Amino acid sequence: MKKCWFIVVLCAGIFFGCRSLGISVLGVRQHYDDLSKEEQALVVWTQPEEFMEHVVNDGRIYAITGKQLRIMIEKSHRALLYAWNPICKSEKCVSLEYLQRACNEQSVELYVIVDYFFGAFSQNTELTDHPLFVKNSEVYGTDRCEQLSKMFLVDLLGNLIYNENTETIWYRYIYFEDGKFVKTMREPSIIVQ
């Protein structure tokens, strides 16, 4: 028991020590300020009422709300939302090119929401049919990833679907049919067979 408390105190000390020294902890926030000026110029901050359905993939990342994405998904027969972490090395995090090809073969629209900016521009942002999206921290009033995800998912799925106590909502893949939520998945198994 003492060992467990020691680990908790050590982790808390490291986390709060980093915060007080101004050291970023990757994944806690979006890291927009850490982008170069050239990369920041490639981020488009949209207005919540702006229609996004005709936006083409021009290599920029569009900051949107869950409601804006829901409007796009509602027009799709089958759609997959991938919460992409640009630096994830897990087998659950597949490449954008591979996933787009698999979705095309299955006639599924792929929408990619970037977890945070760090590493996003080191990839080819034009590998997907639709542009890459990011949760709009200006609209939601925070750049903290966990808070952003909660607010974004409520906008996307509605209060009836989203439940903080349901761990499956944090899976990387959300599948829709005829614009309606079907399920969340750890892997894109519905697409990649």
Language-model region placement:
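Flexible, charged surface loops at secondary-structure boundaries
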Residues: 71-76, 104-105, 165-167
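Short catalytic/ligand-binding loop motif for oxyanion handling, primarily in non-cytosolic enzymes
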Residues: 22, 119-122, 182-184
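Short active-site neighborhood of thiol/selenol oxidoreductases, capturing the structured segment around
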Residues: 69-98, 113
